[in-house]
From Swiss-Prot:
Entry-linked Pfam families: AI-2E_transport
Keyword Cell membrane in annotation: yes
Protein name: Putative transport protein aq_740
InterPro entries: AI-2E-like (IPR002549)
PANTHER family: TRANSMEMBRANE PROTEIN, TRANSMEMBRANE PROTEIN 245
Family: Belongs to the autoinducer-2 exporter (AI-2E) (TC 2.A.86) family.
Subcellular localization(s) per the UniProt record: Cell membrane
One GO CC term on file: plasma membrane
Magnesium listed as a keyword: no
């Protein structure tokens, strides 16, 4: 093939590949989630397929398990959380309408911890009682409540789209389980790269997905459950919302769930009492944060080893650029890049190829 023919071929191939990916762009999230779940659930699919001797039936049963064990419970949890957010918002509005800023400042002055520091905090307390702060507070509360209301309305309006994305996710997962091995072989045979190098990259992606799933997500779920129990026993209102916040905070290094429970514990000690503060301190120190120090290393030690700073930026960058799915995409991109650098050093620098 001469250079002109090669150029024409590559031009048409890359052009239509770009158009195809552009068509898939609206379904990016459900497709990526389907790939992630396909990687994790493929051993289960293989086990069921060997028992039933049917690819279609095995894939359908895995989809049914995902629907019953993950999709439906998550939907119920989302509805309950939305209800608690609405109740919380109503309580905030009622509190603002029935209490003045001066009432709030006077109640703060009665907190034992602040009584001792009253003289040094007097300028701050005077500012908090000023008309300037009152206007700023009202504007901030209006902005927050408007944002919450807009988000809830958008979720209601896009319920149909969300259901369609769930359908796309389940449909894609079905075909990934049933035909994924065949498609993967075709991709491997079509990429002009040494087979062992390509397999190393694919194994890196596989190990990264499993490490993130079992390590990070598993730890976050365990921490949010322990957090919900601790918040409930300590008398924290809207414990389910705080447990949900704890779940997402668990993905943020370096402190994870401690970003939530430590400030909450300080609040309990200074406002509720020593008993409530000690309850959450026990749960936070010995149960919530211990999950991060024990569960995650045990699960991820057989997976990937990434530089901590690089992992921090890849996770945060993934969250910012791709949303929650970025928790997976960030480390995958990082680990694949490092694997590619390793291959480059082995093939090009050391071998001179």
């Amino acid at each position: 093939m001469n250079k002109l023919s090669l150029f024409v071929y590559l031009f048409f191939f890359l052009s239509f590949l770009f158009l195809f990916l552009y068509l898939l762009q609206p379904f990016f999230n459900p497709i990526v989630w389907a790939i992630v779940f396909g990687i994790v659930l493929y051993p289960l699919y293989g086990f069921i397929k060997r028992k039933l001797k049917s690819e279609n039936l095995a894939a359908f049963l895995v989809i049914f398990i995902v629907l019953v064990a993950i999709v439906i419970p998550f939907t119920i949890f989302a509805v309950i959380t939305a209800q608690q957010i609405i109740v919380f918002s109503i309580k905030v509005v009622n509190f603002v309408q029935t209490h003045s800023v001066n009432d709030l400042i006077n109640s703060l002055k009665e907190i034992p911890f602040l009584k001792e520091k009253r003289e040094s905090l007097e300028p701050l307390l005077n500012y908090l009682q000023s008309e300037e702060f009152r206007r700023a507070l009202i504007n901030a509360l209006n902005s927050i409540l408007t944002f919450v209301g807009d988000r809830l309305r958008s979720y209601v309006y896009t319920a149909g789209t969300s259901l369609f994305h769930v359908f796309v996710f389940l449909l894609t997962l079905f075909f990934i389980l049933r035909d994924g091995e065949k498609v993967l072989k075709e991709i491997i045979n079509s990429i002009p790269m040494k087979r062992e190098d390509l397999e190393e990259i694919l194994k890196t992606i596989y190990r990264t997905v499993l490490a993130v799933i079992y390590g990070t997500v598993g730890t976050a779920v365990a921490q949010s459950i322990m957090g919900f129990i601790g918040y409930s026993l300590a008398g924290v209102e809207f414990a389910l919302i705080w447990a949900l916040i704890t779940f997402f905070a668990a993905f943020v290094p370096p402190f994870g769930a401690a970003f939530v429970w430590v400030p909450m514990d300080i609040y309990l000690f200074t406002t509720k009492g020593i008993k409530e503060g000690l309850i959450l301190l026990f749960f936070g120190t010995f149960l919530i944060s211990t999950m991060d120090n024990i569960v995650r290393p045990l699960v991820m030690k057989q997976g990937i080893k990434l530089p901590y700073v690089a992992l921090f930026f890849s996770t945060i960058g993934g969250l910012i650029k791709f949303g929650f799915i970025g928790v997976f995409l960030g480390p995958i991109i990082l680990s694949t890049m490092l694997a590619s650098v390793k291959i480059y050093r082995r093939r090009v620098i050391h071998s001179g190829i």
